[in-house]
């Protein structure tokens, strides 16, 4: 009985940590999507060469927190403190150099075999140090508590903080730069940009009044959603929708049922945390007070096929964009092959 009572609370607390990974751009005005400029790089006379043959080390880069970091040599032992960064590292062909990850790094399959040194925001510093990493790739959730401790230990840490699809592309290139995989990163982001453009060329001219009102839900008790300055908001806009809370607040927040009713979303997109999407979906559609909300009345509540496609700011975000675009505009993009409703 005690475990059953604690489980919802623990899930909620875990989710609060998880949603800190999802952040991005616009608010009351439609966003513009000029490519994010690359992080400033101050070249230092090269002493070593990367695996792709470019004389890039040592280098100085600026991470997403504006920190100037010197990368003295080509990293050989990398620890990732975020599932999205783990996916980026593997996509760049660096799986063999990853020596530590988090409890939630489960993609690709090979990531599951890596030593675990952290939850979402609480790395085991002693275990991490035992792995002797020469590069740690962290996330903005680690800025206040974890980053200072790692810096005091003299560890080399870069921090990513995606707030739009453009900054996700930038983070791929940043990680590629510091690991000697700039060429591979450029190829990966070029492919991602093409897929994003394939969607936005069909949605960019849709006027605000023609965009369906979209509510994104990642937890149900209470309802957690995203405002502006999050990559989820940017993704919804690029997919041709309008995030109903974009002009109300930034980042993530719990909202009341009354607020949802007042916004009257025409489409509800549910991601969930891990495998909890079905639980959230059932809670939303069975909530009597929401029965007159347009999305529920019109049977337009959708559960993402894999929550990680939209929750993780990594290479698979383009798959999430494709899926959301089909939910919002099936008349343009077609109905998803295996629609989850």
Segments from the language model and where they lie:
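A short, structured surface patch at a secondary-structure boundary
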Residues: 58, 77-131, 135-142, 244, ...
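His/Asp/Glu-enriched short active-site or ligand-binding loop at hydrolase and phosphoryl-transfer sites
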Residues: 102, 228-252, 272, 303
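Extracytoplasmic substrate-binding proteins
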Residues: 67-68, 145-224, 245-247, 297-341
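Bacterial Sec-exported substrate-binding components of ABC uptake systems
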Residues: 5, 14, 21-84, 183-215, ...
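Bacterial N-terminal signal peptides that target proteins for export
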Residues: 1-10
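A ligand-binding cleft/hinge motif common to bilobed small-molecule-binding domains
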Residues: 143-152, 267-285
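Short helices/loops that flank or line small-molecule/ion binding pockets
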Residues: 123-132, 152-153, 255-264
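Short helix-initiation/N-cap motifs at beta->coil->alpha
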Residues: 62-66, 117-126, 248-257
